[in-house]
């Protein structure tokens, strides 16, 4: 029963708020609807002006083929000095083709 009363009070409050907005004035900012439209229109035009020409993106100078850095933000790239998923895959496939017992032993670890 209490929730029904709470919902009814919320409906009345929202109805009152929408009526105030439709009249053109709000209590919070005391601006009329036309003043709000003008102020928001000015902000839109400023944002359009700031979205003007941008500088083109430049490719990284060192190691342009591997632009993804390793975890932790270091400057080391994935292809240099670390095991990548591709290299691990190649390692497992190579040894499983030429040494079948390696694959059976490796599957136990996974």
UniProtKB/Swiss-Prot annotation:
One of its GO terms (biological process) is amyloid fibril formation. Changing residue 11 to A: No effect on SNCA binding. Residues 1-61 are annotated as: Disordered. Residues 1-30 have a biased composition (Basic and acidic residues). InterPro entries: SERF-like_N, SERF1/2-like. Changing residue 18 to A: No effect on SNCA binding. It comes from the Eukaryota. Residues 34-50 have a biased composition (Low complexity). The keyword Lyase does not apply. Pfam families: SERF-like_N. The keyword Cytoplasm applies. Interacts with SNCA; this interaction promotes the aggregation of SNCA. Positive regulator of amyloid protein aggregation and proteotoxicity. Induces conformational changes in amyloid proteins, such as APP, HTT, and SNCA, driving them into compact formations preceding the formation of aggregates. This is Small EDRK-rich factor 1. It comes from Homo sapiens (Human). The lineage of its organism: Eukaryota, Metazoa, Chordata, Craniata, Vertebrata.
């Amino acid at each position: 029963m209490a929730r029904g009363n709470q919902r009814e009070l919320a409906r009345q409050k929202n109805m009152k708020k929408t009526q105030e907005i439709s009249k053109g004035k709000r209590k919070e900012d005391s601006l009329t609807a036309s003043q709000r439209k003008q102020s928001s229109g000015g902000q839109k035009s400023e944002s359009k002006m700031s979205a003007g020409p941008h500088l083109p993106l430049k490719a990284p100078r060192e190691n342009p083929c591997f632009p993804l850095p390793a975890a932790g933000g270091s400057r080391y790239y994935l292809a240099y000095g670390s095991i990548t998923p591709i290299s691990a895959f190649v390692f497992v496939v190579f040894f499983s083709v030429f040494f079948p017992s390696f694959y059976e032993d490796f599957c136990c670890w996974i």
